[in-house]
Amino acid sequence: MSSSSYNPYKNNVNDRLINNSTDSFQDNDQGIPNNNDTFLSRIFGLNSIYNQLQDNYQYYDPEFDSSLNQQLQQSIQENDEAEDESLLPQHQQQQQQAAPMDLSIQDKSAKQKSKSSSLLNSDSDSDLSSSEDSYVRPNIPQIPSTPIETENQGSSSKIKFSIPQRAKNFVGKLHPHHEPTLPVYQTPQEFRRNLPQQQRASATVNTNYQRTRNNNRRFIIPPKERALYLWANITNMDEFLSDVYYYYRGRGLLNIVLSRGFDLIILIFILIFTVFLKWGIDYSIFFDNLHQEESKHITLNDMIIPNYFATIPLSIKFILFGFSVYILLRSVQLYLDYNYKLKELKNFYHYLLDVTDDELMTISWKTIVEKLMLLKDYNSLTSTTKSNNFSENHYVNDLSSKVRLNAHDIANRIMRRENYMIALINKDILDLSVLFMNEKSLLTKTLEWNLKLCIDNFIYNQQGQINGKILKEYNRNQLARELTSRFKLAAIINLILSPFIVIYFVLLYFFRYFNEYKSNPASILGLRQYTPYAEWKLREYNELSHLFNKRLIMSMGPANTYIDQFPKGFLVVNLMRLINFISGSILAVLVIMGILLEDENHSFWSFEITDGRSALFYISIFGTIWAITASSATGTSHESTISTTSQSSNSNSNSNAASTFVYDPEASLRYVAQFTHYLPSSWNKKLHTIQVKNEFCQLYCLKIIIIINEILSSVLTPFILWFKISHNSGNIIDFYREYSIHVDGLGYVCYFAMFNFEEKDKNMMSDLNKSKKRRKRMKNKMNKYGKTKMVNPISGKTVNSEIEMTKISKSESERSSDDESGNEQDYDNDEELDYLSYKKDDKMIKSYMYFLESYGGSKQPQPQPPQQQQHPQNQNQTVGGLRNRNPIQSIDPAIMTGNYYDQQSLNSSIYNINYKFDDSGLLQDETMNSSSRKKGGVLGMLNQFYKQDINR
């Protein structure tokens, strides 16, 4: 396909002028109002990412696009030159000077016709490895033509038209007798052949491949050609990559459609079933029949009220109408997504990535990224092939350079908004505390949804980039007022909808967890889950959702083991044992009597122990109480665990059975931290305390409490939005302005997501520089005093000054950081101390290391259980590897936790990693060549971060 290929649904964006300057793009973006996205439309999902069916790649019409067989293509291609020359009169030789500008442009493009081959014109089974100029270019804005003067002027050259191949094929198919075809471009009438009257009339109508009734045959593009066209004409790379990842997470077309369809069916069932139970059954018939002496046999049909929908209150009908509109919109959205997006994504996966839906169940995302990078030369935005056509303007949506496409950039595009949200929570920008409740319990899914609704639509534009007005400091106060008004509007809407939302959540959770509660009551009360606040706190930058969920699931087992090691309180444990014994005794008596007193004439199960309450009712009540208290009574304290262990150790049955459980909460928490990557310095030397356990339980909370908080949040969300979050509008604007950096080929992204360690002014290198100056100052003092004898003024003893200087250095470092005190005792030189200080409790470096592990590192060995402890000398061998380290080859557990001295008896930590990573394939981008690698990019960052170690 040539650069002027026809698009059945033209992009309006192609008609705009493309600014190569980023600043001018931002200024122009400020003046474009976003009237299509409103607050209510976001509530009902009208403008979600899977409902904004833009014109860039979603719409395809098989009536307009066709694929011809190879014989027809060859026959038409042989007559291409003859058709072009037949359009020109032979007697006019001097028309080139007065020719329109578009003809001269097409004359240049016709000379390069032999070098450019379209992916759409290739066979359906053709390979992707074509020539470097074979990718499809976006449409170039057409320059309007002007009439050509009719005067005869002498000229030695001919004017030649370059007709798009698809136009020739299509028109040639309509006219099988090889009649002269019409050029797509506007040309004077005198350059055209004298056509018959019937063909001339049809030519004036069919100008843009409009549907014709003369041809009864239906033309359909092969799926592979459609996939190639989809990829070659992508303009919004952020949205497309998000769709690709959404399809990967959904595990295929069928699974996505069925899951979304069944979710709607569940919602419909909840509404219909609830209304039927409340207004559709006359319960008085049942209770009146129970109190009558001669009870009649009644069925459910006798109790159903005919035409009960008319008796429903008007307010309930209004609520049902709102839910009906919501369900209708979601159904239409599902249909549009299936018809125009999901099917195209399926073709893209199957034909270009060579991944079927069945394979999506087991394939890794790393493999998908590798396959995506192989397609970069087939899209003009991502292609690194140099073009000699200087008149060609690539369609660039948010940048003035090539769109980068590697593992790091793909993750940044998919998680552009999530990275900002992670930084917002970790930097404590939002104040969510209300009265006695802290932010860890108040941040629920409902509040999180409202925050995204208010912030995302305000901060980001339609292309997914940061709004240019946010980056201007003089707009700060005005933007803060606008964001405050959005929070207050959301608070009003939530206040109106809160009663209905509460009812919906109560019914949803009741129907969802009742069966699980019935089968295992203790599982509901004892089951734990990470809170929404913990999910944002523990998530790393550029960590996709499936990788994050994998980490959380792997940490749940060790987390439960860690919590169970703490005593639950003597009063609670003994009270549970008492209740369990009493309820179990009553339950046993009732069950035995029911078995013994059962005969044909009498049934003990229907015997009323109290008025209106049978024995079966009390059996179910006491059985539930016994099941709940049984799980709590078994969780005894530390002393009972030790006594049980000692008793089992005295037995000769199995001497090793006593050592299966070791009470060591400190080692257990470090083992949990290997999965959560969360072990703050405030927990240092306190890992065995109840205080740390309570703080961890705020992140890993009981599921029943999370459900209660979710229901209460529906009532508290309006007040939090109005009185708390609205006062943080200025801080939110400042955060997005200060922590947004522009990357060529990527746009504006969160600072922490770029892993740029060269910046020294954003809490990355300040502590390291301070520690360097402090140690240099102390080293000068030591050199000044030497190893002379001096008297300690406190003890009065003569000591070595070198030892005293070491103590002074240690005490001074303790005032700045507790973590450095332990490290200074175990390392000999300042370089290793600098390295450890740099690693101190830094989320960005943790995210970077985990990113390397996920996308390119060698297979990491599974974390060892905390019972397998090493001696201090073994750890010294591990630390010694740092002295001869290569980039990311050996990371000691003490590096990430910050206190090595406190960890000499333990080998578990946040990271017990042996990285052997070569990122030359995945993290390398061909667009960042020459000198740009020295200052930016992942490889440049690695060189900058480890250049001192390599030179050493």
Swiss-Prot record:
Residues 491-511, 703-723 dip into the membrane without crossing it. Residues 142-159 have a biased composition (Polar residues). InterPro entries: Autophagy-rel_prot_9. Coiled coil: none annotated. Residues 115-133, 867-877 have a biased composition (Low complexity). It is a multi-pass membrane protein. It is found in: Preautophagosomal structure membrane; Cytoplasmic vesicle membrane; Golgi apparatus membrane; Endoplasmic reticulum membrane. GO terms for biological process: autophagy; cytoplasm to vacuole targeting by the Cvt pathway; lipid transport; mitophagy; piecemeal microautophagy of the nucleus; protein localization to phagophore assembly site; reticulophagy. Keywords: Autophagy, Cytoplasmic vesicle, Endoplasmic reticulum, Golgi apparatus, Lipid transport, Membrane, Phosphoprotein, Transmembrane, Transmembrane helix, Transport. Residues 1-33, 69-159, 806-832, 855-889 are annotated as: Disordered. Residues 806-818 have a biased composition (Basic and acidic residues). Residues 819-832 have a biased composition (Acidic residues). One of its GO terms (cellular component) is membrane. Phosphorylated by ATG1. ATG1 phosphorylation is required for preautophagosome elongation. Pfam families: ATG9. The chain crosses the membrane at residues 261-281, 309-329, 578-598, 615-635. It catalyses: a 1,2-diacyl-sn-glycero-3-phosphocholine(in) = a 1,2-diacyl-sn-glycero-3-phosphocholine(out); a 1,2-diacyl-sn-glycero-3-phospho-L-serine(in) = a 1,2-diacyl-sn-glycero-3-phospho-L-serine(out); a 1,2-diacyl-sn-glycero-3-phosphoethanolamine(in) = a 1,2-diacyl-sn-glycero-3-phosphoethanolamine(out); a 1,2-diacyl-sn-glycero-3-phospho-(1D-myo-inositol-3-phosphate)(in) = a 1,2-diacyl-sn-glycero-3-phospho-(1D-myo-inositol-3-phosphate)(out). Residues 1-260, 330-490, 512-577, 636-702, 724-952 are cytoplasmic. Residues 282-308, 599-614 are lumenal. Phospholipid scramblase involved in autophagy and cytoplasm to vacuole transport (Cvt) vesicle formation. Cycles between the preautophagosomal structure/phagophore assembly site (PAS) and the cytoplasmic vesicle pool and supplies membrane for the growing autophagosome. Lipid scramblase activity plays a key role in preautophagosomal structure/phagophore assembly by distributing the phospholipids that arrive through atg2 from the cytoplasmic to the luminal leaflet of the bilayer, thereby driving autophagosomal membrane expansion. Required for mitophagy. Forms a homotrimer with a solvated central pore, which is connected laterally to the cytosol through the cavity within each protomer. Acts as a lipid scramblase that uses its central pore to function: the central pore opens laterally to accommodate lipid headgroups, thereby enabling lipid flipping and redistribution of lipids added to the outer leaflet of ATG9-containing vesicles, thereby enabling growth into autophagosomes. Homotrimer; forms a homotrimer with a central pore that forms a path between the two membrane leaflets. Belongs to the ATG9 family. This is Autophagy-related protein 9. The gene is ATG9.
